[in-house]
Amino acid sequence: MAEADFKMVSEPVAHGVAEEEMASSTSDSGEESDSSSSSSSTSGSSSSSSTSGSSSSSGSGSSSSSSGSGSTSSRSRLYRKKRVPEPSRRARRAPLGTNFVDRLPQAVRNRVQALRNIQDECDKVDTLFLKAIHDLERKYAELNKPLYDRRFQIINAEYEPTEEECEWNSEDEEFSSDEEVQDNTPSEMPPLEGEEEENPKENPEVKAEEKEVPKEIPEVKDEEKEVPKEIPQVKAEEKADSKDCMEATPEVNEDPKEAPQVKADDKEQPKATEAKARAAVREAHKRVPEERLQDSVDLKRARKGKPKREDPKGIPDYWLIVLKNVDKLGPMIQKYDEPILKFLSDVSLKFSKPGQPVSYTFEFHFLPNPYFRNEVLVKTYIIKSKPDHNDPFFSWGWEIEDCEGCKIDWRRGKDVTVTTTQSRTTATGEIEIQPRVVPNASFFNFFSPPEIPMIGKLEPREDAILDEDFEIGQILHDNVILKSVYYYTGEVNGTYYQFGKHYGNKKYRK
């Protein structure tokens, strides 16, 4: 009996598995479903005929077979509803895309690809060009180094300039234009090799012409002498004709005698005006009240007892004033930054050596101070010097790719980049003081820029900080280091950067 029951249970299970396999291999027409239903009915009849021996076992077998057939049919229906039709052959093809180049004929696309390869070669030439510019900057920075050293010595009272060095170089207090320089240069240039022999021959001819010119002058004088000879003849005829002319002639002779008297009067007039002016000045001095004179005497007596003010050494607060007058750096400098920046003695610019990645570094030199232990604070800007296929306008100029700062070794309680706040918590019923460190706005945040992640993007706030940081590096590189004196005097105003703010296209690109 046990063997018969096992056979009765196993047969409908096998039929159910067969039905599932048939349902999975059916087509969209649904003919296989009909065959599966007919097979299930035959299996039900066979199972009922085989179990006619015992009533209890036959009842259990029929119930199991009917439940198995019902479950498989419901599964096949659900599977049929969820089935997705296969894509057609046209849909299986790779999409051409909506790009303009993808819609071109294959022959034209091949030619465009050849042009792209040529453009890659042009970008390689541009990299060499930018590296050559960097080498030129490094070369001329060495020529400027002795001039920067003299500037450093004057600012820090290590050298006192002479009177000649303190005088303005130009006579008209304006730089001469290029045309004026070109007009003056030929006179200073030595003669060329081919012109040395010709010049001596031309000089005697010029001298001969110069000698001939004064010979003509005496001829003119002879003509002038002949004119007065004719005048007495006319006068003689007039005397013979009438006596009235005789009376008129002596009056003409008297005029030359009066001429020297008129000249003497003209000479005496400026002397008289000068004497009047001097007298007016003397009267003005006499009109000064006696009280003012006494006040001036009292001030002189008071100053005798006080020591004279000593002249400041060097140029105090030079770089502080320079940085405050820079368009982007000025708003960054807070009041608590100014006492620290008064110890700033020099700002220099150094370029990377040949063979190294293209970059330049700013060095901020500080005198010993009670705020931090660093003598030099460094900020390095790395320049993009390799072509990028994502940037088609690589050759437009320098582009800052990344920047690196340095760690400031602050003394205890002197860090101005953070503020410490104390918050009291009363959760346990006791008063506890927990210090919290909060970032603070400061110029010295310039030396700790946000790092650019290798993967992903920066936050919008950090991205804006980097953009502004790169602009500051550009301004320091182009103008401030080379022409710091114009920032100190305030001759460079804010409108200067409205036209050259994005000079060189040095902008951070995501």
Swiss-Prot record:
Listed Acidic residues bias regions: 161-182
Listed Low complexity bias regions: 35-74
Name this polypeptide is given: Nucleosome assembly protein 1-like 3
GO cellular component: nucleus
Cellular localisation: Nucleus
Basic and acidic residues composition-biased segments: 200-229, 235-246, 254-300
Organism expressing this protein natively: Pongo abelii
Family annotation (InterPro entries): NAP-like_sf, NAP_family
Family per record: Belongs to the nucleosome assembly protein (NAP) family.
GO BP of this protein: nucleosome assembly
Top-level taxon in the UniProt lineage: Eukaryota
Residue ranges of the region described as Disordered: 1-99, 161-311
Keywords: Nucleus
Protein's UniProt keywords contain Nucleus: yes
